[in-house]
Amino acid sequence: MASPAALRPSMGAIMQTCRSAATAPKVAVAVPVRALSTSAALLKRHKYPTARVTRDNSKQRGESALRKSGTRWKLSVSDEPLPEPVPREELPPIQVDENHGLWDFFYDRETVAMAPLEHTKHGRAWTVSELRKKSWDDLHRLWWVCVKERNRIATANWERTKSELGFGLAEANERDRNVKQTMRGIKHVLTERFYAWEDAVKLAEQDPEIDLSNPENPYTPSTFLEAEETAEGAEASETQSTTTEIDPTTIPSSKSQAEAPRV
């Protein structure tokens, strides 16, 4: 068996070898490192083939008005002077047609809206009983007069709201209410006439003296035809009596009563 003294050199050599291995110089090895970027062009989180495209299509990305970052590229700036506005006093006068139809949308060419007192100067609405007595042409004219009046009221209300005049709106609405009531009465009368016309057509279809297929002369009364036939028969009998020969013996004597022989 070896003595402890004999083992010491071998243990010392082992310890020296381990110490030299632990203190061996390190050699740097270059490892390729991929650059990491947070921009949309370099950052690709999805690697599979069916991954969606995360491309940024915003042309104004990176521009900030708060941070004053500016645009992403330089803009072309020309040295041409900007046009200056012409003063209103130097503008040429605008030619306006004095007889233009749009002037009818205003009550007066000098004012855009009438005073409240002027708006209240109007009559009442037409009643249905009064409109029943009017012809078709009268109702047609009255309807378009009401349309024109409503256009004037709407134009005045628009100008009054735009200019913030603050008056006349209640009076204009009252005037408009009367106009709409008249138009409602016209519709009522025309509806009544239409229903009456439908009833007349149904009765005419059942009347043998009326032929609706003949628009020029649809009514042919039978009494008129009978009277005409009677008149034609009377004329024929009269002509026949004038053409027949007269028997001379049937003619009375032309001698007077004094010359006649006495018995």
UniProtKB/Swiss-Prot annotation:
Region (Disordered) location: 51-92, 208-263
Looking up InterPro entries in the UniProt record yields:
MRP-L47_sf (IPR038340), Ribosomal_uL29_mit (IPR010729)
Question: Which keywords does this chain's UniProt record carry?
Answer: Mitochondrion, Ribonucleoprotein, Ribosomal protein
- List the Gene3D superfamilies: 6.10.330.20
- Gene Ontology process terms (BP): mitochondrial translation
Q: Which GO terms describe its molecular function?
A: structural constituent of ribosome
| Compositional bias segments (type: Low complexity) | 233-245
Identify the Pfam families for this entry: MRP-L47
| Role noted for this protein | Component of the mitochondrial ribosome (mitoribosome), a dedicated translation machinery responsible for the synthesis of mitochondrial genome-encoded proteins, including at least some of the essential transmembrane subunits of the mitochondrial respiratory chain. The mitoribosomes are attached to the mitochondrial inner membrane and translation products are cotranslationally integrated into the membrane.
Family as reported in the entry's similarity comment: Belongs to the universal ribosomal protein uL29 family.
Protein's UniProt name: Large ribosomal subunit protein uL29m
